[in-house]
From Swiss-Prot:
One of its GO terms (molecular function) is zinc ion binding. It comes from Gluconobacter oxydans (strain 621H). Involved in base excision repair of DNA damaged by oxidation or by mutagenic agents. Acts as a DNA glycosylase that recognizes and removes damaged bases. Has a preference for oxidized purines, such as 7,8-dihydro-8-oxoguanine (8-oxoG). Has AP (apurinic/apyrimidinic) lyase activity and introduces nicks in the DNA strand. Cleaves the DNA backbone by beta-delta elimination to generate a single-strand break at the site of the removed base with both 3'- and 5'-phosphates. It comes from the Bacteria. Signal peptide: none annotated. Belongs to the FPG family. InterPro entries: DNA_glyclase/AP_lyase_DNA-bd, Formamido-pyr_DNA_Glyclase, FPG_cat, MutM-like_N-ter, Ribosomal_uS13-like_H2TH, Znf_DNA_glyclase/AP_lyase, Znf_FPG/IleRS. DNA binds at residues 94, 113, 156. Binds 1 zinc ion per subunit. This is Formamidopyrimidine-DNA glycosylase. The gene is mutM. It catalyses: Hydrolysis of DNA containing ring-opened 7-methylguanine residues, releasing 2,6-diamino-4-hydroxy-5-(N-methyl)formamidopyrimidine; 2'-deoxyribonucleotide-(2'-deoxyribose 5'-phosphate)-2'-deoxyribonucleotide-DNA = a 3'-end 2'-deoxyribonucleotide-(2,3-dehydro-2,3-deoxyribose 5'-phosphate)-DNA + a 5'-end 5'-phospho-2'-deoxyribonucleoside-DNA + H(+). The active site is at residues 2-3, 58, 267.
Length: 277
C-alpha cells in the first residue's frame, strides 16, 4: 500500500497538472471500487474549477469550486497516471476513472485490485468525513514533538511499532517508514511504547519527519506497483537501511550483525537486534 510519502508525491503531481483548471470531462469506466462511486460524481466534478489539493494521512482531497471535495484513496495497488488528453495512447488496463481538464491534462485512476475508493464530501466538512474523523496527528505537522509522542504513548503497553502504525494516534505512517525510523533511533520494535524515554520520543519526533521528507524528495519507494504520477519509479527504496534487507549486514554495526526480520501483527518488521534496544 502506498504510504504517506508516496501519496504526497502523487498528490503533488496531480496538483501540478490540475490546480486552477476546470474539469471538462469525467469518464467512469466501472461503477465502483471498494465501494460504489457517488451517483452524482460527474455532476459535482464536470464544469468546476479545481481550487486546491490537500493530503490527510494516506488520502488525497481535491477541492473544487461549489464547495465540494473529492476524496481519493489508492488502496493496496492503485495509482494515478497523469498525461495529456486526446493522445492515441492505449489506456492502461483497470483504469476505472478518468478526469480531463480544459487545459488538456488527463488523470486516470488505475486500480487492479479495486481496494481504492472515491467519495465526495463538502469542503467545510472534510475532517468530519467518516474516514477522516478519527485520524491522529499529521507527522509532518508542528504537532509532531517529543512531548506529544510521550503523551500518546503514556500507559500503552503495545509494541512501539504497533503504536506508530495506529492511525488514530499518528496518521499516515506505514510499515516501511516506521521500520526505518525505529532503526535510526535505536529503538527495538517490540519495546512497549510506554517504556520510551523523553530522549527517545524526542529522537523519533525528529527522525520521522526527516525520513518522510527525504522519501518525498526521492519520489517515494517503488517496491511493487507504486510509480509517481508521471509513471516514473521513486528512488527511496535504494536508501532503505533496514526495510527489505533481511540478512544484509547492519549499516551501523557491520557484517557480524545482519538485519533480521520478524512478524508483528501480520506484517514484516526489519531491524538490527544489536543496535536497537
Amino acid at each position: 500500500m502506498p504510504e504517506l510519502p508516496e501519496v504526497e508525491t502523487v498528490m503533488r503531481g496531480f496538483r501540478d497538472a490540475f490546480e486552477g483548471h476546470r474539469i471538462s470531462h469525467v469518464t467512469v469506466n466501472r461503477p465502483d471500487l471498494r465501494w460504489p462511486f457517488p451517483a452524482d460524481l460527474r455532476e459535482k466534478l464536470e464544469g468546476h474549477h479545481v481550487l486546491s489539493f490537500r493530503r490527510r494521512a494516506k488520502y488525497i482531497l481535491v477541492r473544487l469550486e461549489g464547495g465540494w471535495s473529492m476524496l481519493l484513496h489508492l488502496g493496496m495497488s492503485g495509482r494515478l497516471t497523469i498525461g495529456r488528453a486526446g493522445t492515441n495512447a492505449t489506456p492502461p488496463a483497470h483504469e476505472h476513472l478518468v478526469l480531463e481538464t480544459d487545459s488538456g491534462a488527463r488523470a486516470g485512476l488505475v486500480d487492479p485490485r479495486r481496494f481504492g475508493m472515491v467519495d465526495l464530501v463538502r469542503t467545510s466538512e472534510e475532517d468530519s468525513h467518516r474516514l477522516l474523523a478519527h485520524l491522529g496527528m499529521e507527522p509532518l505537522s508542528d504537532a509532531m514533538t517529543g512531548p506529544a509522542l510521550a503523551e500518546l504513548f503514556r500507559g500503552r503497553r503495545s509494541p512501539i511499532k504497533s503504536a506508530l502504525l495506529d492511525q488514530k494516534l499518528i496518521a499516515g505512517l506505514g510499515n516501511i517508514y516506521v521500520c526505518e525510523a525505529l532503526f535510526r533511533c535505536g529503538i527495538h520494535p517490540e519495546r512497549q511504547a510506554c517504556t520510551l524515554t523523553g530522549e527517545e520520543t524526542a529522537a523519533l519526533a525528529e527522525a520521522i519527519p526527516q525520513i518522510l521528507e527525504q522519501a518525498i524528495a526521492s519520489g517515494g519507494s517503488s517496491l511493487r506497483d507504486y510509480v509517481q504520477a508521471d509513471g516514473t519509479k521513486g528512488a527511496f527504496q535504494d536508501l532503505h537501511l533496514v526495510y527489505g534487507r533481511e540478512g544484509v549486514p547492519c549499516p551501523n554495526c557491520g557484517a557480524e550483525h545482519p538485519i533480521q526480520r520478524i512478524t508483528q501483527a501480520g506484517r514484516s518488521t526489519f531491524f538490527c537486534p544489536t543496535c536497537q534496544k
